[in-house]
Structures are given as C-alpha cells and as structure tokens.
Amino acid sequence: KRRARKEERREKFLVVISPNLTNPYYVMLLQGIESRAKEQGFGLFVCNTQRDLKMEERYLKMMWSLRPLGIIYTCNPSHCFMGMVEELASHIPVAVVNNQNEKLNVDAVELDNSKLGRMMARHLLELGHRKVAYVAPPLTTRQKQRSKRVEGFLKEFGEAGLKDQVIIKAAKEEMDQNIAHIDSEYKIGYELTKELLAETRDVTAIVGLNDMIAFGVLDALHEAKLKVPGDVSVMGCDNTLFARMHKVSLTTIEHFVIFKGRDACDIIMKKITSHNEKYSEIEPISTYHVEYEPKLIVRGTTSYPK
C-alpha cells in the first residue's frame, strides 16, 4: 500500500533527450511530443546534450534520481551509452526516434535514412542530373544516421553507374565537438558550398543533408550570382517550416516529424498503462516499432539541368 501511494504521488512528467535545439527538425519533434503529453496531463523536461558525450552521460545518470514516468530520445543514443539506455528501459519506459539500422533493444519510432538518401538521388537522376554534390555535417561513427543518408544517395547513383560523379563535401569532425549555435548547420551549407564553387562549377545540383544545410547552400549560390534552379538545383530533407515558405520553396523529403513525436509519446503512454494494469501480477512485455513512409515534396528549387 505504501508503495502504491508513493507511485500515486509521483509527478506526471516525461524527459526528452535531444542532441540540439537549433535545428527545426528537433523542435518539430519536441512539438509533437509536447502536444500529446499535454493531452495526457504530462509535463516535459528537455535535456539538450549538444552532442556532448559527458553531458549525455550526466543526463542519463540523473534519470535514476529524477525517476520520470518515461524517457524519449529524439535521436540514437551514443554507442557508448546504449547499454545504459537499455538498463534504464528495463525500469522506465524508453522510446527512441532512431535510424532503423541501429541495433538497440528498446521501443522505437524508426527512420530509414538510407531510403531517404535513395529518394533524393532518384529525384535528381530522373531530372537528368549526372554531376552533383552532397553537403553534410561531419560523417563520424557517432552520427551514423548522417552516413546512412549519404550511403543511400551514393548507392542510387552507383546503380546508375554514376557514383564517381558525386562530390561529398562534409564538415570537419571538430564541428560536432563545439556547442551548436543557432546557425551552425546553415553555416555548414554556406561555407562548404563556397568551397565547392571555388573548386568546380561543373555540378548541376547540390543536396543538403537537411533543410538547414540546404538554406546555406541557397544563400551561397545566390551570392555567387547562380540561379536556382536555372543554373543549379538544390534539395534538402525534413520539410521544415522554412522550406515551405513561398520565397524559399525548397524541394525536400517529408518524413512526418511531428507525427513521430506524437507516436513516441503514445508508446510511452502505452507502456505506463501496461505497467499499471498488471495481468495476474505479471507485467506484459511488448516492443513497439513504428515507421512512416517518406514522401518527396517537389517545389521550386529543382529542375532539369541545362
């Protein structure tokens, strides 16, 4: 009885662990989580790791004393902490919005990044683009979801016999070790595109790993007096709010980010309910995996090459 009363007195809150809050993608995920949590009468604590391993470890250790009713990771946990996350998941409901190819024994709302990369490549190939560039943040082992997206893109071009026609421009690893500024990813797109244009003007299309990078690409091209899509086509990924604005009208990939946030929260709610309604004193064990089919959104920044 005492234990039951203690459980009843626990504050109804969830913890969201996010790698940054500067990219609208994570803000959209958070919006989806928060809207569903609010409907269910839950509050949220947000832990921003800033892709710092020490910060991530510190937050994970804090969970034992905070004792939230659930934890949502808005990206894959760092590899060195996957064991800690699985241990937490055996005591507290945990859901991860992750890259489908990662091996993690917890509930997940999955994203097949390789498929996203293939979709981006297929769109450009169908338009007739043959010489293209891909602009990305650091492609490190810690950030496998980025590499998977690039790999999918290269695979599609490879199957068309054009893999050697793709230029990969990735930021240096130090970028992930610095605290992200509000314009960090935009700057990656802007600076790497300027570098690219100094090296070659042969490319007919430039892809940003995400929309924020693509915005930087657009500004660098505008500064170089190159027309989009007349001279160079540009493509992003995530279908963030800014991509939809009339002046930008960015071709991108929609993978239903807000819905994923809501689904991650729903998974936690189901786990909390099943924990509270034990069947013959045996807690049911279930694993949830949700995946959305991504959709190409063609707008005004991609067209046939000259």
PLM regions and their residue ranges:
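Flexible loop/turn connectors
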Residues: 194-306
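An alpha-beta-alpha
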Residues: 120-162, 280-301
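Alpha-helical recognition/docking segments in bacterial nutrient-uptake
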Residues: 8-122, 126, 198-201
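Short beta-strand elements in bilobed, periplasmic/extracellular small-molecule ligand-binding domains
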Residues: 37-48, 154-186
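Hydrophobic alpha-helical segments within soluble ligand-binding/sensing domains
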Residues: 109-135, 151, 155, 186-195, ...
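Short acidic capping loops at alpha-helix termini that bridge into adjacent secondary structure
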Residues: 131, 163-166, 228-233
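N-terminal helix-turn-helix DNA-binding module of bacterial transcription factors
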Residues: 1-10, 306
